[in-house]
C-alpha cells in the first residue's frame, strides 16, 4: 500500500491540546478554546466581528420581522459556534486563513439575508428594490447575471436551507417532514426535498420580478423546482425560466446547445427586467473568475507539499461562495484572495501545522454532510489525516476569454455555458465515468495522497452505482479507501458520532493506529447546534 511520510510539528503549541473535553452534551461547548494570548485575542476579535454582522442584519429593513416570521432565521444565532468548530486546534497562519475566508463567507450570506428580507413582501416589502431582483437557485453558477450590473441575483435558498444546516444540524428536519407529509418519498435527496418543504410551509421569502431555475446539481433538483416554480408563478406572479444544463457535459457536442440556452436565458432576463446585457461588465467579471482559478490552484500546489495551509471545510465553502454565489460579480473577493495568498505563502515558509503530526494525506471525494462538515478538521486533530482537497472544490481548471471584442461574444456564451454545466459537485457526479472516477486518481497523484475518504450520501444515486469501481481501482493503486455514510442534511439517519465512528473504525482496525487526541474520538455533541 502507498504510504505518506509522517510530518512532525516542531513548534510548541500554545494553549489547549485536547479538544474533546470542551464538549459537554449541551447546545454549545462549555468554553471556547484557549490558544495562547496572541491567538486567543485575535480569535476573540473575529468573534466580535461575527456578532456585529448579525446585529446589522437584525437592524436592517425587515430584519426584526424576519426573526419573528421565519423559523430559519434562528439558526444564525449559532454562527460563532460553527466558526469555532472550523478553527479547532488552529494557531498562527492557519487560524488567520480560516477567519479571513469565513469572515467574508459570513458577510456574503449576511448580505444575502439582508437583501432577501428587504425585498420580501412579508417583511421589508421594499417594492422598488424587489423589482430589481432576480431569484436564482442556490445550486446555480450565477453566470447569467455577470453582465447585469443594474440588478441583483437573490439566492434565497442559501440562508433558508444551505448555510442554515451548517450552523445547526436539525435545521432541515422540519422541512423534510413537511415534504413527506405532502407525499414526497423519503428516499430522495434531502436537500431538494427540504427546499420543497420550505416552499410548501411558506418559509421562503417572496420577492423578485422574475426567477431562473436550473437542473443542477442534479436532475433530482427538478422535483423541488417544480413545486417551487408553481408557487412562484401561480400564487406570487413571478415568472420562472428553466435553464437546462446538459448532463453529459464532458461531451463537446453539447456545448453549442448549452450556449444557445444561455443566450435565451439572458434575453429572457432582459425582457422581464427591462435592462440590457453589458459586455464590459461581463468581461470584468470573467477576469476575476480566472484570477480565482489561478489562486485556487496555487493553494492546491502548496497542499501538494508537506506543509499544506488552506484546506478543509472552509476551503470548500469559500470556493462555493466565490464561484457560485459570486461568479466574478463582486469586486471584494480579489483583495480577500490576495490576503489569503499572503498568509498561505507565509504559513508554508514557517512550516505551520494544525496538529502535532500529519500521518496521512487524504483526498475527500463525494458529497459531504452539511450538518457534519467540520469533520475534516476532526480528522486532522484526532487522527492526523490531512484532507488536502475535496470534490466540491475541484470546480474548473481552464481559463476563459477575457478580451472584450465582438468576435469573442459567441465564445463568451460558450464559456458561460461551460461554467454553468461545471458547477460545484455536478461537474464530477455527472458527465460520465471519466470525470468522477478517473479524475480522482489524477488528483491523488498530483497532491501526493495515500488515502481517499469517500462520502457515501445514502440518497444520492450518482456515486453509489460506482462503489465497486472505486474499491477495485483503489486496491490496484494501493490507496486506502474509507467509506463514510451520511444523509446530507438529516442527522436522524446518521448522527455526527456515527459518521466519526466509521472513520475511527477504519483507522483502528485497518491502519492499526491510535488517535492523536483520544478525547475527540467520542464527543458528546448529539444535542449541539
Q: Model segments located where?
A:
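Hydrophobic alpha/beta core scaffold segments
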Residues: 375-389, 404-424, 432-522
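Active-site and donor-binding regions of nucleotide-sugar-utilizing enzymes
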Residues: 161-249, 255-257, 483-485
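Extended, charge-rich low-complexity interaction segments
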Residues: 187-205, 267-288, 415-437, 510-529
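A charged, amphipathic alpha-helical module
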Residues: 10-11, 20-27, 34-133, 259, ...
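An N-terminal, globular interaction/scaffold subdomain
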Residues: 99-204, 225
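Gly/Ser/Thr-rich loops at beta-strand to alpha-helix junctions
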Residues: 134-143, 215-223, 365-372, 458-465
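Redox- and metal-dependent alpha/beta enzyme cores, enriched for Fe-S-associated oxidoreductases
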Residues: 129, 138-177, 363-432, 436-440, ...
Amino acid at each position: 500500500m502507498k504510504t505518506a511520510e509522517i510530518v512532525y510539528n516542531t513548534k510548541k503549541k500554545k494553549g489547549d491540546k485536547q479538544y474533546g473535553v470542551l464538549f459537554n452534551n449541551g447546545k454549545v461547548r462549555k468554553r471556547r478554546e484557549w490558544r495562547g494570548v496572541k491567538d486567543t485575542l485575535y480569535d476573540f476579535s473575529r468573534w466580535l466581528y461575527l456578532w456585529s454582522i448579525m446585529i446589522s442584519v437584525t437592524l436592517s429593513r425587515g430584519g426584526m420581522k424576519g426573526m419573528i416570521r421565519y423559523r430559519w432565521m434562528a439558526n444564525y444565532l449559532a454562527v460563532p459556534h460553527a466558526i469555532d468548530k472550523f478553527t479547532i486546534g488552529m494557531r498562527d497562519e492557519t487560524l488567520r486563513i480560516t477567519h479571513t475566508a469565513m469572515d467574508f463567507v459570513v458577510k456574503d450570506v449576511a448580505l444575502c439575508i439582508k437583501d432577501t428580507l428587504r425585498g420580501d413582501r412579508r417583511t421589508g416589502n421594499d417594492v422598488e428594490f424587489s423589482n430589481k431582483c432576480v431569484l436564482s437557485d442556490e445550486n446555480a453558477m450565477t453566470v447569467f447575471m455577470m453582465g447585469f450590473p443594474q440588478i441583483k441575483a437573490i439566492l434565497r435558498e442559501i440562508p433558508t436551507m444551505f448555510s442554515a444546516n451548517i450552523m445547526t444540524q436539525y435545521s432541515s428536519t422540519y422541512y423534510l417532514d413537511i415534504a413527506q407529509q405532502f407525499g414526497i418519498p423519503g428516499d430522495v435527496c434531502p436537500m431538494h426535498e427540504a427546499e420543497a418543504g420550505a416552499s410548501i410551509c411558506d418559509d421562503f421569502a417572496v420577492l423578485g420580478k422574475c426567477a431562473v431555475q436550473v437542473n443542477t446539481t442534479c436532475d433530482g433538483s427538478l422535483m423541488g423546482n417544480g413545486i417551487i416554480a408553481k408557487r412562484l408563478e401561480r400564487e406570487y406572479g413571478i415568472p420562472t425560466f428553466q435553464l437546462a444544463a446538459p448532463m453529459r457535459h464532458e461531451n463537446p457536442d453539447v456545448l453549442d446547445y448549452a450556449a444557445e440556452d444561455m443566450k435565451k436565458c439572458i434575453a429572457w432576463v432582459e425582457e422581464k427586467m427591462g435592462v440590457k446585457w453589458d459586455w464590459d461588465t461581463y468581461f470584468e467579471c470573467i477576469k476575476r473568475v480566472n484570477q480565482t482559478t489561478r489562486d485556487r490552484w496555487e493553494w492546491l500546489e502548496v497542499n501538494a507539499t508537506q506543509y499544506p495551509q488552506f484546506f478543509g471545510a472552509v476551503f470548500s465553502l469559500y470556493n462555493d461562495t466565490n464561484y457560485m454565489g459570486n461568479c466574478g460579480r463582486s469586486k471584494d473577493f480579489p483583495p480577500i484572495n490576495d490576503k489569503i495568498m499572503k498568509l498561505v505563502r507565509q504559513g508554508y515558509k514557517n512550516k505551520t501545522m494544525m496538529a502535532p503530526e500529519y500521518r496521512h494525506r487524504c483526498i475527500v471525494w463525494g458529497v459531504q454532510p452539511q450538518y457534519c462538515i467540520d469533520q475534516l478538521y476532526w480528522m486532522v486533530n484526532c487522527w492526523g489525516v490531512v484532507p488536502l482537497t475535496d470534490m466540491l472544490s475541484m470546480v474548473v481548471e481552464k481559463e476563459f476569454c477575457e478580451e472584450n471584442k465582438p468576435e469573442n461574444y459567441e465564445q463568451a456564451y460558450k464559456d458561460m455555458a461551460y461554467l454553468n454545466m461545471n458547477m460545484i459537485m455536478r461537474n464530477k457526479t455527472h458527465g460520465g465515468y471519466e470525470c468522477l472516477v478517473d479524475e480522482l486518481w489524477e488528483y491523488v497523484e498530483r497532491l501526493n495522497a495515500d488515502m481517499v475518504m469517500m462520502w457515501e450520501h445514502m440518497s444520492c444515486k450518482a456515486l453509489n452505482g460506482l462503489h465497486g469501481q472505486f474499491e477495485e481501482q483503489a486496491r490496484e493503486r494501493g490507496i486506502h479507501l474509507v467509506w463514510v455514510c451520511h444523509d446530507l442534511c438529516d442527522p436522524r439517519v446518521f448522527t455526527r458520532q456515527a459518521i466519526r465512528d466509521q472513520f475511527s473504525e477504519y483507522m483502528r482496525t485497518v491502519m492499526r493506529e491510535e488517535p492523536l487526541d483520544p478525547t475527540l474520538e467520542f464527543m458528546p455533541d448529539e444535542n449541539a447546534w
